[in-house]
Amino acid sequence: MDNKAGLIIFIIILALLLIILPVLSSIFTDFLNRYIFNLSLVPDNFLLLTFKNPQTYINFFTRLSPSNMLCWGVIGLFIIYSLFGQLSSKNQKRYLRKDDYGSHGTSRFQSPREIKNNYFKYNSGWFLGSDKPNLTYHVGMAGAYQPLHGNLNMQIAVFGSPGSYKTTAFVLPNIFHIPFIYKNTPEKADLIITDPKCELYSLTAKYLKSQNYEVRVLDFLNLKYGDSLNPISFISGDKELMEIAEGFINSSSVSKNAYSADPFWEKSESQLLGALIGFVKQVYPKYQQTFSEVLKLLTSQNVRDPQKAEVFFTDYCVKGSALQLWNNYLLAEDKVRANILIGLATKLKLFSIPGLINITETSTMDIKKIGRKKDKPMALFILMPDNDKTFSPIINSIVTSILSQLYKTAASLGGSLASPTYLILEEMANIGNIPSIEMMLGTMRSRRIYPMLVWQSLPQLKNRYSDYWEDILSMCDTHLYLGINDDFTANYCSSSLGDTTIKIQSTHNKTSSILPDDSPSQSQNYYMRKLLLPDECKRLPQSGLIISQRSLFPSILSKVQYKYWNKKDRICAPSFLEDLPEIPISN
């Protein structure tokens, strides 16, 4: 029966009930009260008179009597039952989550009690968010935290598309929160922060200074303000030499050409760069051990001329891995050497920029102090452009140098740092490929190094670490999804959340008339379903975030923004880069 026919029949039956029931109610009332069930007193045309009398229908709707109330109930039940039958489809289907049944999967979201137990007991760890919506961040607030001394490591991978509040709801709150954790403890934590656009420094520097932090800045935005750092000066072994060289080459912003598309060229350039850095370290005085001197050396006749190159390193008594790398370079034919030289010279052309020479010529800060006990903890901001990867190679070299130095410091202190060090690597794709990061992540916890790796998407990570991206993710016990735009990240997120079991219940109603003339038949079936489908991951509300952790069910929390644009919500006044001292111009 179609809806139109059913409606017509419904109206007809309702009209008949509204005619017949008032007459029946009136007859019953009269028989009871007036005629007292004596048929001899009933007029011959009593039924017709009752039917035609308007007072019959007026009394039905205005008088409260048992017979009227009974008839009203009949009409009401008819309306409810008829509407229920018409609005319900012939085949009703719905599904229920049945992870407790678990025939096809047991994944589910954490219950409110589990969330409280897992994230709200302690505040000594990364700040994650809240179980309450629409909150504004303030230091020390009640919220969800990844416990510092819990069973999971503190290595966290964060993914958020542009506009997903990565900075305001995650990075900024944690810069404020980390000093708060150690406020009343003997030890203090050091901070290493990569800062696109100088936003993080501007919004947090005064707060950090108020917490007795020594705030340092490496300015790769203007190449003008703050500190300078020469990564070559901190190289103390062959392994570090090669890590610096490999990181620099792999992170080059130069577009791939016919040669660099082949890994042979990048490896050859890395070997040559490592050899030249080793030469500078062994032969030049300390003040000349710089990247700009490496560039000068590369373009000198001693390197360019094939005959002079054969004896160049031996004439200066260069030894160790530097000599071996140089000999590897000499094995190539002259034409191949020329291409290697051109490729490396193109990548080192950065060091013809005066500002970059100034910022890498000397070191006004000592990264050997990071992780050690000292009077003031250190917060280092590495400012970098968010729309230009020109300086990615040298930024990569600096981050690589800092990580290597942290491991050396930990080794000198018995295996772990005296002061825990937090790495907040915002826009990590702009740093490039950090050598051996997948191996370091496996040992950072024991060294008391706690990294936060922030990406816009999984394809960014895969692009930078094509062979190791899954290793990097597996070393991070916590994955956060703040917002997803691309299919690859959505599919990965959906897959990592796991499968659950759903029950689909089908109800078949036979509705050939206005009232079902047969009892409903039901069937139940169990199926597998992703806890969240990829499209559902992409439709995550702007205010929400997904937490996926090893050994725990996933959960969805609310983001908590630091609303610095509202003066009443500011934790500190903004700082300005121009207030920092300018870097002296190199001679």
Which role fits each region the language model picked out?
Residues 441-546:
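Conserved ATP-driven motor cores of ASCE-family P-loop NTPases powering translocation/secretion/packaging/pilus
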Residues 135-142, 253-264, 504-525:
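Low-complexity, polar-biased intrinsically disordered regions enriched in Pro/Ser/Thr/Gly
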Residues 131-146, 322-336, 502-506:
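N-terminal short leaders/motifs
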Residues 1, 372-373, 472-473, 521-522, ...:
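Short alpha-helix boundary/capping motifs
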Residues 1-173, 181-187, 510, 522, ...:
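Basic- and hydrophobic-enriched, low-structure N-terminal and domain-boundary segments
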Residues 22-26, 33, 147-449, 464, ...:
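P-loop NTPase motor domains
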Residues 113-122, 393, 428, 484:
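A short glycine-/small-residue-rich loop at the edge of a beta-strand within enzyme catalytic domains
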Residues 107, 138, 142, 150, ...:
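General secondary-structure edge motif
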